[in-house]
Amino acid sequence: MVNYPHKVSSQKRQTSLSQPKNFANRGMSFEKMINATNDYYLSQGLAVIHKKPTPIQIVQVDYPQRSRAKIVEAYFRQASTTDYSGVYNGYYIDFEVKETKQKRAIPMKNFHPHQIQHMEQVLAQQGICFVLLHFSSQQETYLLPAFDLIRFYHQDKRQKSMPLEYIREYGYEIKAGAFPQIPYLNVIKEHLLGGKTR
């Protein structure tokens, strides 16, 4: 090998390619696990669900070189609604993803009024709306229907957090798997759709 064009030896490449990879979920962020799950659902033709981009307004860009443009100042254009949306078996799906290190509750400050309003609007149009909650310290994941989140949100605005007991009572635990990593469509089919599909 001539080591062209970057003078990187092929021996080094072989070493890095032959290193074993660890595919465990440990250390992977919850959102990355959801993205991997959505990619799996898409590849299997089960659902089309994507992360919503956050709209930003670019104010200033540095151009040290044409090929190295760098955004140096940008602002959120508007408050985002929920994290993900898409279609599953003819049903519109819209959901938010939250992760916490707390063991007994999820902070309510994580849910903003515009997100609650958006969820109410989705439910009014017969969409499937929920929140996926991940307690990283216990490695527990729950699907909480938006109806139950909204009810808790409105019942007592002074509550600073939603207790895990409430989530366990009204939500559905999702056991992590390999493919998909967070099989939330199973919960939707069995519990939110009552086993029906279109």
UniProtKB/Swiss-Prot annotation:
InterPro entries: Resolv_RecU, Restrct_endonuc-II-like, tRNA_endonuc-like_dom_sf
Full protein name: Holliday junction resolvase RecU
Chain sites annotated for binding Mg(2+): T81, D83, E96, Q115
Coiled-coil features, chain-numbered ranges: none
Record's keyword terms, sorted: Cytoplasm, DNA damage, DNA recombination, DNA repair, Endonuclease, Hydrolase, Magnesium, Metal-binding, Nuclease
Lineage of producing organism: Bacteria, Bacillati, Bacillota, Bacilli, Lactobacillales
Cofactor requirement: Mg(2+)
Pfam families for the chain: RecU
Assigned protein family: Belongs to the RecU family.
